[in-house]
Amino acid sequence: MVEENETGTPGTSRTVTFHDGRKLTDAEHFVFFKVKEVIADKVAEAEILESIRKRSECKPTDEQFISDIINELFYSGEPPKGRKSERFIGPLFDPEKASTASGPMDCTDVVSYDSTHPNISEISKKEEVEMQSAIQQSLASSASQNISRPTMLMSNLEDMVRNPNFSTGLYNSGNTCWLNCLSQVLYSIPKFRSILYHCAPLSWHEQPITNVKIENQQHAELLMLFRGLFAELQFSEMKYIEVGPLINMVDKLSKSSKGPSTIGTQQDATEMLTLIFDWLQRAFDAALHAQLNPEFSNVSDEENLVISDSTTTAPNSDIIGAPPGYNAANLSLPSSSHVDPKSTLNPMYVNEKEPSSTPTSLFGTRSKTIEVNESMDTEAATSSNLPGNSVENHPNPAAPEVDDNKKAFCDKLKESFNNIFSSVCYTESVAEDGTVSVKSNVRNCPQFFQLQVTYGNLHDALEAATFDHGLGNTASHVRNLYDPLPAVIFFGLSRFSFNSNIESKLHDKFTFPKIIFMDRYLKCNKEQLVQLRSHRELCRDSLSEVRAKLSGLRRYPQGNGEVRLEDSFQTVWQAVSNFREFVTFYLKVSQKTFFSREDAHENTAFVGPLTPSTYQSSSDNCSSKFVKDGGKLFPTFTEGFFPGKAAFIETLQNMLEALKTEERDCLAEEARLQEVIDQTYEVPELQQHKYELHAIIVHSGEANRGHYWTYKLKKSIDGLEEWEKLNDQNADRVDWPKVESDSFGTGSRDAPSAYMLMYVRSDAEWLVSADKLTALEAFETIPPDLQEKVLQKRDEFKEKLQRFRENKEFNYQQFSVDSPTVQSTEETPSSFSWYRDELEDIDIGDENANPTKNDYLLNARLDSYSVPIAPDVETSEMKRMVSQMWNQITKIAPRKYTDSQDLLDSNLRSVMEGESGGINFINSRLGYDIHELRSDADNDVEGVYNAFINEYLGLVKDLHELQNSKFVVFVGFQLQRIHVPVLRYLLVRAMAVSELGIISQRANNELSGMSSNSHDKGTAMLQIALLLSHFFELGVMSAWGCRSSLENIHVILNDFKKKNSRGSEQIEVTYCAMIGARNARICNGLLREMAYFLESYSIFFVSQKHIEACTVFSTITMIKLIMQHMASKTLQLIDMEFHLSKNERRVRFEDIIREVVSSVCIIHHWSKSYSKEFQNEINLKELMGLLHLKVEFMVSLTSFEVADPKYECLQAFKAMVVNTVMDLERASNELDYDVLDGAVELRELKKYFKELQLTDVKVNNIITSYDPIIESLVKI
């Protein structure tokens, strides 16, 4: 027996011990009661604990661990007295089935206590409740110690708050865009989600689900997951949610049907829709069965413990009775019925009995054709036909009485389901003599039409799918008619083809209207349709003849080519009538160019037309440059040469007019016939069943890769049409032209195109009435379990958001500026932080990227939505930092940029320049120079514009040097927390500021549109771009300063040793090395001060050790040069002054001393927090100790006259040793800002650093060289 000891301390959990005094750990608590919950008192508690503890090397909360314990307790040795030996197999304990029943076990999920459970005795109920409470408290207290798992939440939770005017998005966890789209499309059918909400019985709310057949258990779990997902989509306050459990269940179902894994792989959306719908339909049947048969259970043991896997006789069936079979007449919702295998129409409706090797998927074939026929689809279905039930060979006892209201409720659900999706297709064969024979009747659920995009438009493709003009060599044809059609119709657009067994995607343009009438496909209109279709076929035959005539007139054979017959007659008429000769003479007269032609031309024999080679051959000769170009001399036909010329010309004119008239008549007849064909069904009688386009799934990519997103119709309260783009996490408002351009396709491989369409019957108000409820009214209509789940999720998010806001407010108070922020009285628009989630790794080349990746780059134009503004505190902080950095940049390079925006645009132009720049990328994509791109070449303009935004970064991401030379590349890969919309802004602005003709114009239009749509006219985005460009410029400047310093140190340590140089040259080079080091220190220090704002420390081009090295070596070298001048009897300190050769500024001795003092203070400051981590680093503490010792010795033993400038230098050195207070350093413009490309700067810096090997040894050598100089000073 278990004892409980309360500590008595408020808020602490109880400890649970056995009589032997051994306390149970939290994990042991959890496992103990998991096991005890199942086996109750059939095994002694001590035996349970012993079995748990002897497996302590295993993970104690793993499901396999618990399963092993239970199996061991029931299989090891003889069972205890009074306990039967039983085998436990079920979803909870069978490893193969455990994962299908629930997700991975979580220590925080304790199974709730059920007081009605038959295994809980009345004596132990109170104790059990208290024990469960103790476990829950213990686990809750230890939950905080669990390792946190990655989350889909953004680092800035403000970005997760959903705008109530937009739909909830779905998180893309990796190639799940297809499931996101299907979920959004199914969710957009209000009545369907209502059916899912209410069809599930209460018994399904607990795991594992037992009130269902074993073979349908996973289907039931799928339905429950869709219920939860739809409820979250409808009521969540988060911008997007995840579908993790749902994709796992779909994967299990796919693999159980011998299909491929769906996790992490792209799937064919249309194929997966049919499969998911089949699974949901099975679950719906099972749900209604459970509603009407609440006693049904797949558990066959008398104590509800043992789940039998027998396929013969169920144990104890005489006690609990065999579960009743499904009532096929009342509950079946068939997905398909038998179809004559000879029919070639509508392969989607044919249930092939044998696996087919023909691929049916855009993304590949499944290993086996999945049967969708159910044995309960017909009245003849009996329980003996249903596999997996161990008791179906026994007569079914009478089912318990069910309330009439429950029966009516289930009937209503079934009726609504059928009205939404179910239809019956009647396939008829019409012989040549008009005899009609019915081939088959097929029930389709859902009604899914597979259309070939090669027909170009929806109605032609639909007619081809439903009407066949002949089978084999017979003259009969087959037609499909429907009665009825459901409220929702799906169209799949077949966009795959095979060429040499290689699957490829068809990018053909395919148009479809927003409204269609389906009356022409209904069985009730059969008689009228037969007449209209017959008339239409006659018109089509006539149209075929007319087009054949037009083809003969316009494509008349000539040699190896074709010519227009009218043009040929026109040419002959002009030649015979000397038309060209007259034109030539007229032009010469009109230009006052008179010359006489020889009469011989009139008698020139006509020997045939002059071919191009005849008169071009001489011009091709090398001497043609000396021969004047005489133009063309056309042959002349005279009456003498051509008797009857006048009559022939008249005949030609008549024939030419006849040809023109015939062509005009053919064109008019073609237009008339086409209009008749198009208007055949446009009669009021065939416009009763109106369907409206409701959703589109669009695909971009190729057959084996790409990305899906959804367009969904939303109607405002006043009935206005609005379209919403649901691209994984993102929901944006778009207009119909945008939907049309993305859906119809253009034939280009780069253009997206529609892949699936969903139409909804316009008069089906009952279908969408749920969307007309207020949020509160809708919430009250969903079942209590979903209400609880929604409220729980909402409370969790609100709590996280509140904590985030409190932390964020605290952080802003720490870094807020002193100047007050003016608060606007207007409504504050939505704001955003431009930081991206740290857990999101940007992968520009991925085509299944999150909206923060390339998908957002390609599709979310900045002018397509209102870009939120940055919070006032962020904007003020950014402006302050930009101003501070701009001041430092202008001190170093005062004339390089006119203002901050010029700095930004200059960096953006550099992105487009160079061998690996954007201009070369665009030229390579176009195949010709960008400046030759015409403004009317819409496809090229659109393609290359999007390609640059989408692919350029992915192309150069592996060129690591470019990450520090191209500004936008640096932002994209070094500052990985920057949101992708900022990257798009930078790429678009880069095209705008470059001279790229129509491309620049297009980029400027997008930026202008963004400014118009933004509440702050794009100020926030510009401010972010300015800040990033200044960060980049400071990074390049720090690399430049460090490189120039090391370059001068290289000259000091190497070149000056090889040649006799003047002292002034050494001083100038050393001074320049010090200035370079100072600028590097200032730029790098300023970046470090501001790194907190980016929450990133990847913005530095150079490391601290590089800056320390160039500062130390330049400083100690300059000290040595000063000492040499002080110890010299001939040299004076004024001799150290020099003119900077680059800017002709004279550097005075005082400037040099001041620079040395400042650098020594910096080194002293570094040495205070110095800890040597690498062997080759300079030991700053030892350096400062040696330097102070040398200088103090020199100062103490040396004296000069007060009037001597060397005395002032000595006092400066003395002050440097005594006073180590670091003064504020200022950047210097004494050096020419001859900055190289960022990558080149770093390459040169690393080269010099490696060559110089600036280590303690070289430092000691320079410091040791002070000794003879100090001895000379002492002697003086």
UniProtKB/Swiss-Prot annotation:
Domain USP: from-to ranges: 168-762
Residues making up the signal peptide according to the UniProt record: none
Gene Ontology terms for molecular function: cysteine-type deubiquitinase activity
GO cellular component, one term: cytosol
UniProt cross-references to Pfam families, sorted A to Z: UCH
Catalytic activity annotation: Thiol-dependent hydrolysis of ester, thioester, amide, peptide and isopeptide bonds formed by the C-terminal Gly of ubiquitin (a 76-residue protein attached to proteins as an intracellular targeting signal)
Enzyme class, spelled out: hydrolase
Gene Ontology terms describing biological process: protein deubiquitination; proteolysis; regulation of protein stability
Keyword terms: Hydrolase, Protease, Thiol protease, Ubl conjugation pathway
Keyword Transmembrane helix: no
Composition-biased stretches (Polar residues): 380-393
Alphabetized Gene3D superfamilies for the sequence: Cysteine proteinases
Annotated catalytic residues: 177, 707
Protease as UniProt keyword: yes
EC number(s) reported in the record: 3.4.19.12
Record region (Disordered): 375-402
Family: Belongs to the peptidase C19 family.
Annotated protein name in UniProt: Probable ubiquitin carboxyl-terminal hydrolase K02C4.3
